[in-house]
């Protein structure tokens, strides 16, 4: 499935949340879902609900691809432990998302650009693959020149240290952060801009693999 390239505000309106963390909340101007002029939303079938939860998760992590969902599920489904937690961890610990959570970028899309353009270092080495899986103990920092980028400095200045997830540490002065421990399911859920039923998504994917 191709990457979504349409208006991001349309996605936010569809789910009724400022899902991408933008300064201007698109719901203030148009609170209704696209194509609707009232607040009534149609009741969905079980299959429709599964699709919606899947689309919500994709949006929460910067419009990730269908094949990335399937790949993540295949990697965890036969492992011991909480499948839903391990599945969600695959996306929460993506490099672009960690960069976003640390406050190096105001939005997940800006974080994706920082990674793709080679501004981000992992344990001192450049990594430009946004889907790179960050493991506990890995340090995330920026190149010296990149520390002076306006999008970085402005974002860090506005970063509330108290909003930093417990599984991350941040040294603002050094432009450096670390994934301290693997995040728990409830910790990840608290960081998402809207509730996502991960179990429903895993059930849907179980019929696709």
From Swiss-Prot:
<dbReference type="GO" id="GO:0006412">
    <property type="term" value="P:translation"/>
</dbReference>
<keyword id="KW-0694">RNA-binding</keyword>
<keyword id="KW-0699">rRNA-binding</keyword>
<dbReference type="GO" id="GO:0015935">
    <property type="term" value="C:small ribosomal subunit"/>
</dbReference>
<dbReference type="InterPro" id="IPR036986">
    <property type="entry name" value="S4_RNA-bd_sf"/>
</dbReference>
<dbReference type="InterPro" id="IPR001912">
    <property type="entry name" value="Ribosomal_uS4_N"/>
</dbReference>
<feature type="region of interest" description="Disordered">
    <location>
        <begin position="22"/>
        <end position="45"/>
    </location>
</feature>
<keyword id="KW-0687">Ribonucleoprotein</keyword>
<dbReference type="InterPro" id="IPR022801">
    <property type="entry name" value="Ribosomal_uS4"/>
</dbReference>
<dbReference type="Pfam" id="PF00163">
    <property type="entry name" value="Ribosomal_S4"/>
</dbReference>
<dbReference type="InterPro" id="IPR002942">
    <property type="entry name" value="S4_RNA-bd"/>
</dbReference>
<comment type="subunit">
    <text>Part of the 30S ribosomal subunit. Contacts protein S5. The interaction surface between S4 and S5 is involved in control of translational fidelity.</text>
</comment>
<comment type="function">
    <text>With S5 and S12 plays an important role in translational accuracy.</text>
</comment>
<feature type="domain" description="S4 RNA-binding">
    <location>
        <begin position="93"/>
        <end position="154"/>
    </location>
</feature>
<protein>
    <recommendedName>
        <fullName>Small ribosomal subunit protein uS4</fullName>
    </recommendedName>
</protein>
<dbReference type="InterPro" id="IPR005709">
    <property type="entry name" value="Ribosomal_uS4_bac-type"/>
</dbReference>
<dbReference type="Pfam" id="PF01479">
    <property type="entry name" value="S4"/>
</dbReference>
<dbReference type="GO" id="GO:0003735">
    <property type="term" value="F:structural constituent of ribosome"/>
</dbReference>
<keyword id="KW-0689">Ribosomal protein</keyword>
<dbReference type="GO" id="GO:0019843">
    <property type="term" value="F:rRNA binding"/>
</dbReference>
<comment type="function">
    <text>One of the primary rRNA binding proteins, it binds directly to 16S rRNA where it nucleates assembly of the body of the 30S subunit.</text>
</comment>
<comment type="similarity">
    <text>Belongs to the universal ribosomal protein uS4 family.</text>
</comment>
<dbReference type="GO" id="GO:0042274">
    <property type="term" value="P:ribosomal small subunit biogenesis"/>
</dbReference>
